[in-house]
Curated annotation (Swiss-Prot):
Transmembrane segments: none annotated. Keywords: ATP-binding, Cytoplasm, Endoplasmic reticulum, Hydrolase, Metal-binding, Nucleotide-binding, Transport, Zinc. Homodimer. This is ATPase ASNA1 homolog. ATP binds at residues 29-36, 236, 263. It comes from Culex quinquefasciatus (Southern house mosquito).
Length: 348
């Protein structure tokens, strides 16, 4: 019976090989190294996809630090890559910062409708934040990237992001159902102010267009062929607890997840005596790794090392990203470090 439950390959190669994936979310508790992992995954995907976009939805915007390059809310090419792009969005931006192009039109009716639109939308809980995401999704879909990687904010924000299609669909659905009741009143208001073009269709046209996009995204998020979520954690109680909560919430939302990255692990090297602190930490991590193996036997569990230097800059991210595909070997890493030092010494 034991042979029937062989552990799955400890790498993210399954994601690279699944060409149908459009949306990949990377998330977990704060401070576990989500950004390094999401940037590394994006780098590996860029080797195998026509075009890849990584989006940071974390207000801290750490992807600029990871690649050592400033990114904005417009997709920019990552230095050293031809097909990898990055952008940073603020999940707290509301409708006041939606572009004016969203409310196109030269007449005063459209200018008034922007204010009315914001007032109505603002009255629906959660819609304001969700609509800013909706506008981003509209932009991303129009650019037609092969794969989009989301470097998400800590767990709570992430779950809100993933539920936004439902929130928007529910809220906009209510508005559109009210359209017939409000239509005569809106037309009267338009006539009163001498704006014959201001009617219910003006107000709801954009909503209907947005709702179509939202429904498509909602459908795609719940399709395991197109969307998956990679959970990142460290081998500690609180992180493992948060990961289990996240996995349960994702399952409840109908979002696929079958990969877990355990980051910042200590690895023992043959012939090297660890210090007392390292031995103690190694023992604690071993206990939680056993629990992870029991809880997630049907997941790909990737183990990443705790490094003595930061992973910063495109070249270092490229190098670290290999660990997502090939299981980390401390002996191999030590040999590579020695070779690098010798090369640096020669170049000097």
């Amino acid at each position: 019976m034991e042979a029937d439950f062989e552990p799955l390959e400890p790498s993210l190669r399954n994601i690279i090989d699944q060409k149908s994936l459009k949306w990949i979310f990377v998330g977990g508790k704060g401070g576990v190294g989500k950004t390094t992992c999401s940037c590394s995954l994006a780098v590996q995907l860029a080797k195998d996809r026509e075009s890849v976009l990584i989006i940071s939805t974390d207000p801290a915007h750490n992807i600029s630090d990871a690649f050592d390059q400033k990114f904005t809310k417009v997709p920019s090419k990552v230095n050293g890559f031809d097909n990898l792009f990055a952008m940073e969005i603020d999940p707290n931006v509301g409708l006041n910062e939606l572009p004016d192009e969203y409310f196109e039109g030269e007449n005063s009716a459209m200018k008034l409708s922007k204010g009315v639109f914001q007032e109505i939308i603002g009255a629906l809980p959660g819609i304001d934040e969700a609509m800013s995401y909706a506008e981003v999704m509209k932009l991303v879909k129009a650019m037609n990237f092969s794969t989009v990687v989301f470097d998400t904010a800590p767990t709570g924000h992430t779950l809100r992001l993933l539920s936004f299609p439902q929130v928007v669909e529910k809220g906009l659905g209510k508005l559109l159902r009210l359209k017939m009741k409000l239509a005569p009143f809106i037309s009267q208001m338009g006539s009163l102010f001498g704006m014959q073009d201001f009617n219910a269709d003006t107000l709801t046209g954009k909503l209907e267009e947005m709702l179509t996009i939202i429904r498509q995204v909602n459908e795609q998020f719940r399709n395991p062929d197109q969307t998956t979520f990679v959970c990142v954690c460290i081998a500690e109680f609180l992180s493992l607890y948060e990961t289990e909560r996240l996995v349960q919430e994702l399952t409840k939302c109908g979002i696929d997840t079958h990969n877990i990255i355990v980051n910042q692990l200590l690895f023992r090297r043959e012939g090297q005596a660890p210090c007392a602190m390292c031995s103690a930490r190694y023992k604690v991590q071993g206990k939680y790794l056993d629990q992870i193996a029991d809880l997630y036997e049907d997941f790909h569990v990737v183990k990443l090392p705790l490094l003595d230097k930061e992973v910063r800059g495109a070249e270092k991210v490229k190098k670290f990203s290999v660990n997502l595909i090939e299981p980390y070997s401390p002996e191999k890493a030590a040999a590579e470090a020695v070779a690098e030092e010798e090369e640096e010494g020669t170049s000097k």
